[in-house]
Curated annotation (Swiss-Prot):
Protein name: Aspartate carbamoyltransferase catalytic subunit
SUPFAM superfamilies on file: Aspartate/ornithine carbamoyltransferase
GO molecular function: amino acid binding; aspartate carbamoyltransferase activity
Quaternary context: Heterododecamer (2C3:3R2) of six catalytic PyrB chains organized as two trimers (C3), and six regulatory PyrI chains organized as three dimers (R2).
Gene: pyrB
NCBIfam families membership: asp_carb_tr, PRK00856.1
InterPro entries documented for this protein: Asp/Orn_carbamoyltranf_P-bd (IPR006132), Asp/Orn_carbamoylTrfase (IPR006130), Asp/Orn_carbamoylTrfase_sf (IPR036901), Asp_carbamoyltransf (IPR002082), Asp_carbamoyltransf_Asp/Orn-bd (IPR006131)
Family indicated by similarity: Belongs to the aspartate/ornithine carbamoyltransferase superfamily. ATCase family.
Organism: Endomicrobium trichonymphae
Reactions it catalyzes: carbamoyl phosphate + L-aspartate = N-carbamoyl-L-aspartate + phosphate + H(+)
Record-listed carbamoyl phosphate binding positions: 58-59, 108, 136, 139, 264-265
Top-level taxon of the source organism: Bacteria
Binding-site residues, L-aspartate: 86, 169, 223
Length: 312
């Protein structure tokens, strides 16, 4: 199995067939985690470079572990000690790394579209690890897989996204994937943090969490970006907590088997209470584990372009 593309730039333009191919490929990689030796030689001789212009704990380390478990060589570029601080352009940085025979380049950037710029200029496979407010496709995929693993289906699932939908690249990747796989999606948050016209995608909009949380199968809680308060997009942290924190009391309003998810890092006591984060309904740590297996699958399914390859 493979994807019919060399890059993973987002989920908006990834078809249902490719999404299902990824879901079907994750299980065998996850089964390696229970073995004493967790490595396979699938990518031996390949070089994976991570290029993160923004901070990351989970995503960068997850990609590194995934690549190493596939026996790839991994190079982490430290932006603040590289030529980037001397003004080197994104394309020149990418071409330099490709000249060093990098096969995969995993990039996180504050600029929406930065991975696409590299994909159009390089033969290496480009994987978007988060670009501005645009997308975070592997987070969307690991969230999708976690739901699939726990609920045994995606079609017909009722999924609620809570919080800052407007600025969340995680929300956007979740929405694109879930729409294509047939889930019913709802969002809830302050009106200033809900995108206009999101209902045109078939997404139901709520502003009352107590109402929205009833009858859903999955609650995916997004990190509230506290800097948004300075932009007057919500009045105060205290008011946000009162209206939108997922608490034990609100969890009791949902179905008994509702999944509680969070992409991390969590602001305990703000968007989610500690009781809920540590509850049996929470699968937050399982999301992290699944992220490694999902990223292993993505690395194996993409097809880097062979420069100067002869035609058949």
């Amino acid at each position: 199995m493979s994807l019919n593309c060399k890059d993973l730039l987002g989920l908006e333009h990834l078809g249902k067939k490719d999404l299902q191919t990824i879901l079907d490929s994750v299980g065998p990689f996850k089964s390696l985690f229970t073995r004493s030796v967790k490595k396979v030689p699938t990518l031996v001789g390949k070089t994976v470079v991570t290029l993160f212009y923004e901070p990351s704990t989970r995503t960068r380390n997850s990609f590194e572990i995934a690549a190493k478990r596939l026996s790839a060589d991994v190079v982490n570029v430290t932006v603040n000690t590289s030529s980037i601080v001397k003004g080197e352009s994104l394309i020149d940085t990418g071409k330099t790394l490709e000249a060093m025979k990098a096969d995969y380049l995993i990039i996180r950037h504050s600029l929406a579209g930065a991975p696409d710029i590299l994909a159009r200029n390089l033969n290496a496979s480009i994987i978007n690890a988060g670009d501005g407010f645009h997308e975070h496709p592997t987070q969307g995929l690991l969230d999708l897989y976690t739901m699939y693993e726990k609920k045994k289906k995606i079609e017909g699932l009722k999924v609620l996204l809570v919080g800052d939908i407007l600025h969340s690249r995680v929300a956007k990747s979740n929405i694109w994937a879930l729409i294509k796989m047939g889930a019913e999606i709802a969002v809830v948050g302050p009106p200033t943090l809900i995108p206009s016209n999101i209902e045109d995608l078939g997404v139901k909009v709520y502003y009352d969490l107590n109402e929205a949380i009833k009858k859903v199968d999955v609650v995916n809680i997004l990190r509230i970006q506290l800097e948004r308060q300075q932009e007057n997009l919500f009045p105060s942290v205290h008011e946000y907590v009162e209206l939108y924190q997922v608490t034990e009391e609100r969890l009791a309003m949902a179905k008994p088997g509702v999944l509680i998810m969070h992409p991390g890092p969590m602001n305990r006591g703000i968007e989610i209470s500690s009781d809920v984060a540590d509850s049996p309904n929470a699968v937050i740590n399982e999301q992290v584990t699944n992220g490694i297996a999902v990223r292993m699958a993505v690395l194996c399914l993409l097809k880097p372009k062979r420069k100067n390859a002869s035609s058949d």
